[in-house]
């Protein structure tokens, strides 16, 4: 659905007769419930005025159809689906000025030359009140993509004659404390010039200050599912006036077993609302949630691909080694990548105890390091992240709690000391570097214990044009994968009567 064709396929299609094209289009419309499909190049958002006018004309005439691509500077292909998606009024933005939004709302965009692809495509739909699904890699500017429309939504509601004061209008749900705090930091800063207030609700810390903030009145609530549900049940957090809902990292929330909490929270919001969902992948569980809680014809924008793929700005180096040699190799790599101890290096491990052990080992060998994992108190985690972000301690050891969504600027190197449990987590880990168009390096240790994931890793490396070490292919390259026209090749077959994910915490788990 909305998947783009290769240039070779486009050439073949162009040779077919008009009659064949019409027949295929009719069948497609029937299968897609008359959804209009537009596939365009992300770089179109930054093209010249002439190209933008041409794009608008094509949209108005319906000339842009499924499978059409425009290659320009190696940009990513953007696929847009949904009823009315081809309307000229939804043409992607070429500049911030093209939005005609109030200066105070756009204040948060100062310093950026132009909207990122996800912002350029999302804003026209979101500002028009459409339900929206965004599939894009981390580091693509998603927070501002939904943040600016959220601010405009609050401004409109505050301007209504019957508007209540001090009640939440916008809800943003996030899977982890750190990501929730990061979103809150952005929205607090962005909302200040507009007089719009936000509060962040997350576990691992006292409820007192959060309750006080809610009682004093806020416009935007950002939170994790667990703490949100607790405060709702206490009668402290009332969401009945929330008419703009964002589910950020939706796939991660469901992976963590938060589906019951998400459903319970959504049921507390206004029945008439705008629902926005951002996700790095599009698995069946997320699709099902969208079907239940969104408009029957939401807009869906896919930046790049729905399939599992790594950031092409990251050079991936995979080293197959014995488990016992990881400590010495880590030290050797730090001598190579972090000798001056000034550039930011992020080392990922799998378990909380492992994070503490590696941190201690490196400190004993003279390295200044901090760590972030679930056993640390929230204020210690926040302090460690701050030291790393500001560069006071540019070497951090972290569990996967830091692999999703966190925007840590200028991370030059990611080292996977322990390979993650899934290839998806691998992609998100290495996505901490190579952000915002910069280049990065990801060096990964792969051991005999990880051999079951070798085939998937080989596919990720090949898709990104990276070197595949012969030692990795010896583990096998076969991947059992079921194709689906709806979900693509990254599709997991789930039986209809299969039990839903539940949140299970192990002794050394790092889920919050």
From Swiss-Prot:
Cellular compartments per GO CC: nucleolus
Q: Which UniProt keywords apply?
A: ATP-binding, Coiled coil, Helicase, Hydrolase, Nucleotide-binding, Nucleus, Ribosome biogenesis, RNA-binding, rRNA processing
Localization terms from the record: Nucleus, Nucleolus
One GO MF annotation is: ATP hydrolysis activity
According to its UniProt record, the EC number is 3.6.4.13
Domain annotation Helicase C-terminal: ranges? 333-476
**Nucleus as UniProt keyword:** yes
CDD domains named in the record: DEADc, SF2_C_DEAD
Q: Which residues form the signal peptide?
A: none
* UniProt domain Helicase ATP-binding: residue ranges: 123-300
Query: Motif span (Q motif)?
Result: 94-120
GO terms in the biological process aspect are: rRNA processing
Q: What ranges does the record give for the region Disordered, renumbered to this chain?
A: 1-33, 45-76
What is the superkingdom listed in this entry's lineage? Eukaryota
Which sites bind ATP? 136-143
Reaction catalysed? Answer: ATP + H2O = ADP + phosphate + H(+)
Spell out the Basic residues composition-biased ranges. Answer: 16-30
Q: Where is this motif: DEAD box?
A: 248-251
Member of which family? Belongs to the DEAD box helicase family. DDX5/DBP2 subfamily.
Q: What does this protein do?
A: ATP-dependent RNA helicase required for 60S ribosomal subunit synthesis. Involved in efficient pre-rRNA processing, predominantly at site A3, which is necessary for the normal formation of 25S and 5.8S rRNAs.
What does the comment on domains in this protein's record state? Answer: The Q motif is unique to and characteristic of the DEAD box family of RNA helicases and controls ATP binding and hydrolysis.
> What protein am I looking at?
DEAD-box ATP-dependent RNA helicase 5
**Species:** Oryza sativa subsp. japonica (Rice)
């Amino acid at each position: 659905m909305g998947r783009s064709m290769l240039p070779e396929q486009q050439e073949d299609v162009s040779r077919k007769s008009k009659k064949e094209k019409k027949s295929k289009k009719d069948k497609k419309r029937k299968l897609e419930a008359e959804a209009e499909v537009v596939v365009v190049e992300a770089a179109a958002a930054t093209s010249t005025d002439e190209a933008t006018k041409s794009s608008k004309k094509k949209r108005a005439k319906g000339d842009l159809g499924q499978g059409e691509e425009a290659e320009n500077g190696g940009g990513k292909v953007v696929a847009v689906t949904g009823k009315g998606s081809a309307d000229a009024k939804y043409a992607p933005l070429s500049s911030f000025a093209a939005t005609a939004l109030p200066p105070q709302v756009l204040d948060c965009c100062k310093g950026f030359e132009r909207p990122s692809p996800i912002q350029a495509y999302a804003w026209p739909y979101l500002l028009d009140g459409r339900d929206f699904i965004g599939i894009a890699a981390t580091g693509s500017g998603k927070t501002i993509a939904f943040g600016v429309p959220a601010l405009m939504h609050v401004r409109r509601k505050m301007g209504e004659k019957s508007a209540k004061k001090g009640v939440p209008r916008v809800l943003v749900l996030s899977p982890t404390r750190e990501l929730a705090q990061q979103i809150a930091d952005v929205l607090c800063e962005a909302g200040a010039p507009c007089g719009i207030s936000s509060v962040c609700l997350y576990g691992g810390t006292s409820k007192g200050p959060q309750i006080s903030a809610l009682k004093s009145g806020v416009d935007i609530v950002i939170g994790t599912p667990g703490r949100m549900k607790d405060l709702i049940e206490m009668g402290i957090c009332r969401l009945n006036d929330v008419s703009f809902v964002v589910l950020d990292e939706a796939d991660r929330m469901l992976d963590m077993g938060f589906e019951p909490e998400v459903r319970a929270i959504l049921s507390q919001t206004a029945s008439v609302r705008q629902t926005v969902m951002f996700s790095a992948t599009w698995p069946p569980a997320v699709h099902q949630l969208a079907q239940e809680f969104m408009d029957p014809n939401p807009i869906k924008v896919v930046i790049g691909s729905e399939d599992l793929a790594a950031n092409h700005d990251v050079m991936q180096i995979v080293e197959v080694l014995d488990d016992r040699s990881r400590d010495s190799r880590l030290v050797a790599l730090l001598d190579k990548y972090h000798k001056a101890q000034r550039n930011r290096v992020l080392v990922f491990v799998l378990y909380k105890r492992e994070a503490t052990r590696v941190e201690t080992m490196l400190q004993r060998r003279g390295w200044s390091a901090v760590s972030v994992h679930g056993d640390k108190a929230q204020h210690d985690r926040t302090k460690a992240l701050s030291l790393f972000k500001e560069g006071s301690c540019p070497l951090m050891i972290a569990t996967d709690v830091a692999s999703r969504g966190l925007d840590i600027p200028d991370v030059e190197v990611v080292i996977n000391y322990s390979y993650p449990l899934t290839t998806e987590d691998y992609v998100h880990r290495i996505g901490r570097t190579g952000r915002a168009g910069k280049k990065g390096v990801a060096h990964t240790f792969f051991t005999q214990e990880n051999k079951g994931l070798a085939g998937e890793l080989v596919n990720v490396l090949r898709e990104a044009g990276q070197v595949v070490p012969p030692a990795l292919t010896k583990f096998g390259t076969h991947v059992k994968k079921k194709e689906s026209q709806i979900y693509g090749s990254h599709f997991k077959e789930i039986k209809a009567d299969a039990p839903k994910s539940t949140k299970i915490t192990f002794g050394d788990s790092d889920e919050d």
